[in-house]
Amino acid sequence: MYLRKSKKPNGRTYLTIVQGYRDAGGKNRARTVKSLGYVDALEAEFDDPVAHFEEECRRMTEEAARAQAPVTVEFSAARRIGKRSEGRVELGAAVPSAYLHRDLGIWSFFERKRTARGFSYDPCRILELLVWDRIAHPSSKFAAWEARGRFPRKCGFTADDVYRCLTYLDENAGALVSSMNASLEESRGPRDASCLYYDVTNYYFECDEEDGFRMRGVSKEHRPSPIVQMGLFLDSDGLPLGYELFPGNRNDMTTLLPAMSKAGVRDLPWGERVVVVADKGLNTSANIAACVLDGNGYIFSQSVRKATRGLKSWVLDDAGYEESASGSFKIKSRISEKAVYVAGEDGKRRRVTVPVKEVAFWSRDYFERSRRERAKVVEKSRAAVARGDLSSAAAKTPVRYAKDVPVVRGTGEAASHNWVVDEERIAADEAMGGYYCIVTSEQEMDDRDVIDAYRGLWRIEESFRVMKGDLGARPVCCSTESHIRAHFLVCYIALLAMRLMQLDTGRKYSAAQISEALAGVTGHLMDRNLYLFDYRTDLTDELAGAVGIDLSRQVLTRGQIRSIMADVKKPRS
């Protein structure tokens, strides 16, 4: 290291600390390590800035030399492993910790809370540990606490502290999510919330009893266990914006408005509006009316099978469609009216009509997929009818093309159960194969833009898969409602951190790849002060580079590990 003194055109001298090195071709190069400022400005702080920083350069050179010096470690062949000693450190945790502190501002949030409430534990540290556990190796809260020795920060809290913290996190969940959103906008600029994607899923519990929150409902996994519903919002870039939890027996269609209120997108400042994009299960009169009255927009899919006779006829009519050159896609639209019911000041519901744009399209890919799926169901239905072992309880989705008729065809004799294949329903479904319909308030939006916006729902479906799979959100190992709610807050924060990591690595890697890479950055204790690391990939380099740290070193001291963890708490440079 040496001090470079650069004379500027304004006559002032600028100081920088520079490091010399040789490039791959053997040529001498120099890189700027630190920009210091003008000498005359530094004289207000140092008597002799040049002498001071020349001494600093010598100190940094000596430190760099010591860091590159060979390390010798001796092991005894008789040495035994301590049963209670932890010989590993998961330094990959530094990457998500950087996002928690720099982008989501969790330390600042809890510091503000600290002045109003005394803590016997550090809620920020506990949350950091639980989020890392979700990302690297999802487990119970107690198991995460037991593995705290591998976390690269001191975790001097008890298991009871963790459970007390869960209650505290639940009490402050709404404020924390709002604070994270504000911090994210401060660090990365305004978020694109012009389109908000919304969907609902549920999570099962390995218990038998309902308790008012964990309730039996329509399980996505077709399990009889009690479930909890989660509604999730994503912004236009696919980043989580907010969520809400509901009892398991809550109908999906009734969750949108409470979730919008929780996310703060119902009472927006004058002139601001969002367009809510959701599937057909959310396409209800109440949701459409609320969006219109709030000054917001909507893009909802519409079931062709359950549509009115007029809408179904229009969708299936070839007239008006614009077909692609390949013949694999066709589209048309029209301005129409939709009846909705609005509660008046007297509390009575009144029927009103609102103008809507209906976009119909047909896709060969969708057609082929629906044909394959329908063929499987038809085959099961025919086989079930041939066996004659159907009951009314069995005539559901797997055999939905079997119907019970009151008389035997041909003889006219009465029969308690006479199952036949419903050929008319098969033909009707074949006619609708590949057709989709979308209803929207955005009359000026291009038809293809409407479809593209609707297709963006795959991001939220994939987010649910990540939460349930890679982040291990189910089955939930908590039992009280406050702890269950805190568990999903941790999962939500882990998902948001994961999405930011994917964004900063060009969306090239899956959540599973990132989790595996970070979990692999584990150091093994060689002696009291040295850790040996043996895992490095292009992905770990990209993740570390995104937050400005170096995870490529094979040997690190405890002090160097502490320094890395301190660096990720500092603001982004």
Please give the residue ranges for each predicted region.
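Anion-binding and metal-coordination hotspots
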Residues: 2-15, 25-28, 106-573
